[in-house]
Amino acid sequence: MEIQAALKKLIDRQDLSTEDMTDVMQQIMTGQATPAQIGGFLIALRMKGETIDEITGAARVMRSLATPVSVKGDLTNLVDTCGTGGDGSGLFNVSTAAAFVAAAAGAKVAKHGNRSVSSKTGSADLLETAGVNLSIPPEATARAIEDIGVGFLFAPSHHSAMKHAIGPRKEMGVRTIFNVLGPITNPAGVKKQVIGVFDQSLCRPICEALQRLGSEHVLVVHSDDGLDEFSLSAPTLVVELFKGKITEYRVSPEDVGLESQSMDSLKVNDSEESLTLIKQALDNHALDRTQGRTQRRKGFDDNGRISDADADAHFAQIDAAGQLIAFNAGAAIYAADLAQSLAEGVVLAQDAIGSGLALAKLHELASFTHLLMEDQS
């Protein structure tokens, strides 16, 4: 089907078949459609609402045109934590931090991601701030996943065909089907994922699309307080694909041994603040409460010794960050089939944080990417 004909159908609020959507996406991704046609199509599709058939067809085209990352060895526990972003919460990079915790717990993590579009900091922004070189070839990314347990798949490096849609997307400045496609077009071909989405209505369609695309274990989530993550301050809707069946349920922090609490202190302004909080959370959980407070009280500010109240507030912030990371990492560990339940996954995540291995994985990936580029120069 030609894009003009598809556009007419969408204007009449008619759904496209998987085959029709495949035809149109091929035209968009191979430069056969004009910017005006692309923009009109994306807006008309958004206004009608994307169906499972349309998401599936579009994802198949993006996957077929992606530059692959061929991970060798046992892929039983290969998982991704990439979400849609765009929830507007301003929180630190939770899913990226969770990726390193899952790797420390034994998963192989192919973390797909990009720079920030609407949030304070994207996964690529955070990792670049942490010293990770984003400009490594696909075979090097595969080696990082194999040897370290985690690698970063920088979306622009693997989805070059997206260049044809970048202009219209930026000029329109609204969410389109491409915001949904990113998490379901991982170049490493993962079949196990945790996907946070910006709108609860997307949970079921994305899960069903992934079922058609051959995924094995997937958790698509959106919290009742609007996060594209598991939340500490409200129940989270989970649409889970496992063993060919899809189930829906809600999870509260107490269900997995955590505490419900405010997350206002977990908002950041940029990647520097996000990285600092993540490092503190992953490092602090190797300490107990008393030791952590004792160490912080050795510091001074302009008015003298830091107060107990300030120390307690700082500890509470780091503790909340650690719990939020453990919640989401636990889901990744469960999706990777390293735990029998989400609650068990959270326990394994807490162990990985407490051991210091999660923070070590972050440093290891940064060192690996830079040593690799030095060897090639």
PLM regions with names:
Residues 11, 42-46, 80-85, 332-335:
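Short glycine-rich or small-residue beta-strand-to-loop segments that form or flank ligand, phosphate
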Residues 19, 42, 92-148:
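A glycine-rich phosphate/pyrophosphate-binding beta-strand-loop-alpha-helix module
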Residues 83-88, 113-119, 158, 224-225, ...:
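Acidic, glycine-rich active-site loops and adjacent beta-strand->loop/helix elements
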Residues 40, 97-101, 324, 328-331:
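Short amphipathic alpha-helical face segments that pack within enzyme cores
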Residues 1-2, 10-56, 63-73, 324:
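N-terminal glycine-rich anion-binding loops that anchor highly charged ligand groups
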Residues 9, 64-67, 91, 106, ...:
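Glycine-rich anion-binding loops and their surrounding alpha/beta cores
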Residues 49-111:
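Active-site cofactor/substrate anionic-group-binding motifs, chiefly glycine-
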Residues 13, 31, 83-90, 283:
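Short, glycine-rich nucleotide/cofactor-binding loops
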